[in-house]
Each structure stands twice: as C-alpha cells, then as structure tokens.
Amino acid sequence: MLLSANGLTSVKDLMLGVEAYESRRSPASKISNLIRSRMETELQTAGWEVMVYPTEGVLLIQSPERSRSTDRYLHYVFNFNTAAWGFWRDVKSLSMTMLRERIYYGDSEGSIWYMVDGEDNVTLAAPAADGTPVEFSLLTAYSSGGLPGQVKRCAVIKPIFRGVGLLGSNYKVLYDYEFEELPAIGLNSTSGAIWNTAKWDAALWVGSNTTNIPYSTLGGGIGVVMAVSLRGQSTGRMTLMEITAFYEPGGVM
C-alpha cells in the first residue's frame, strides 16, 4: 500500500494503470476525505506510516502529532473482520514498527512502548495492580429497522459484551443522523448473580466470560432512522457481541 495526497492506493492497482485519484478503488475510500484534508497541510510532516497488524487483524495508518488539545494523536484503523474504519486515539506514537507480530512505537519523550494486553500505561515491572483502563467510543451505522419511511421510538437498549476484566459503558440512541459522542464513565464491578441466593428481578445473569449490562430505559427521541452511540472503558479484551433494542413504530413521515 502507498499513502499519498490522493489517499491510500494499492501497488497492484498502480501497476495495472489505475489512476491514484480513483478513491472508490482504494481500501481507504470511506475516509479519503479525512486523509486528504490532513494531507493538504501535513503532507511534508514526518509521522505518516502504513502497516498491517496481523495479530489484531487491522490495517493501520499512523498520522503525525498535532499541536491541539483534542485528538492530538489520531491514527486511522481498518478492521479486516468487520470491514469498518475506526480511530486509535491518544496512542502517542511518532514512529511505529513490527517485531515478532507486535507493534512497538516511540513517543516524543524518548520512550518505547509496545501493544499488549488490555490496559494502558503498564510498567515493565508491573505490581499486582498496574495500568489504566483503555477507553473506547462507538457509533453504529444508522438503520431504519426494516421500516423505511416510518417514524419510530426506541424504548430500551442493552449492549452485550464478551471478555474478561472490568467494564464501564455509557450508551444512547440517536435519531436521523445525529452525531454525539457521550462522556466517559467509570468501571462497573458488577458481576453475575449466584443462582441459589440472588433475587430474580434484581439479579444480572451472565456466562463466565460475558459482561452483562442492565437494560437502559430511554427518555425522549423519535426519528426515521436510529443508531447507538456507546462509550466506555475496560481493563481487558472485550468484544461487543450485539446490541438488543426494543422500539415502537409509528406512522409514515
């Protein structure tokens, strides 16, 4: 892969004579506008790199450090499993390399880091409790729920995660192409209930590796299409298995 002012281009396509500006053929076509807008002012800035990270199944575009208070470090990541783009935020990388299937990167303070496990800022000689939770943010694709043209109101939602460690999450339904990133929330130490002693209406029933989150009763909101904005943090590797949603359809717009 080659990264240029035209975006991300396959070497194979270039050898076949495909024009680099044909963004629809690029694996980064969905974020080409983001890449190009940054290239306009940062093309000559050191810090651009492209690599495949097989262990995580992602294609990574590292971008230069920016002098700003938010998203100072922002790297673009394509997940081969979901065929979706996302960001790595606050990974203070100025240069990256692969060694034995692991990413190593250097920061502006002269430190070298590597990516492993489910926590951040873990020291080499780690005590029993070390590191900080990794934060994440997600906005699902908007959907009409199989009822295009009809307004609808979501009553309750419930995300289901599978993994190990502690998890804390905050989530909300958005309507008609709103964009809102929710505030962060602390970790939730709640685990599964004990069968013979827990009360049915108050207990959370989970598997050994499933983190259960209570159903959230939602407030206002109505629209034709819906999406879920979710933000949280965890101390271990987590997989979002599904988001269960119950909604009421209304009349035609």
Residue ranges and their predicted role:
Residues 4-253:
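Beta-sheet repeat architectures centered on beta-propellers
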